[in-house]
From Swiss-Prot:
GO terms for molecular function: cobalt ion binding; tetrahydromethanopterin S-methyltransferase activity. One of its GO terms (cellular component) is plasma membrane. This is Tetrahydromethanopterin S-methyltransferase subunit A. Keywords: Cell membrane, Cobalt, Membrane, Methanogenesis, Methyltransferase, One-carbon metabolism, Transferase, Translocase, Transmembrane, Transmembrane helix. It comes from Methanococcus maripaludis (strain DSM 14266 / JCM 13030 / NBRC 101832 / S2 / LL). It is an enzyme of class 7 (translocase).
Amino acid sequence: MADKKAPAAGWPVANGEYVVGNPESCVAVVTLGSHGLDQAAIDAGAAISGPCHTENLGIEKVVANYISNPNIRFMVITGSEVQGHITGQCIKALYENGIGDDGGIIGAKGAIPFMENVGTEPVGRLQSQIVECIDLIDVEDTGKISDAIKNCISKDPGAFEEEPMVIELEGGAAAAGEESTSIKPTSPEMALLEARMRIVSEKMNEAAMIAKFNSGYYNGKIQGIAIGLFLSIVIFSLL
């Protein structure tokens, strides 16, 4: 039997609409925007299963719950993709590419894919701990999902060698004896506001560039007309 470790006290550490199974299971499931899939995932042997609707705060909670349980080594992304947020693709991009210096998920296509409370260390831990990400985005067939979970369990490599990493998303204290990363919490409202301000700033810069181009274009056009009229007058005066 594969070696197992105790997850962080009170696991899952981040609250949400999760269904929790055996915490020693090596599989965690994200059901994105679908409903009614979580219990089937738990029945198939998953440690935790739940939806993820947003590409920022929602993903942060997924990361927090996964890295605080070293037994989780496989991540199954399934269920219907969340329109606009494109959360499934963002989670996959986070696992494959990580985040940039600004906290943005590299290669993510969601509206606001920024990690405000999760830094490079927790993301790196997720990338090291998870040995395989199974892409079943837009799959709602419980049979296929169950088969994927059971296949992962058959390949269980055992618990990750490091202790649980606890992220204080909401200012909670880490339990004694656990590896913790203290991150200054940001309220959901501020996180979204800052991200939207960045987007507005980018749009304003784009608009300024377009306005500058148009201004130069029209100024050049007027100058061309003036020069043409001047040359016409000169030519007619010589006739």
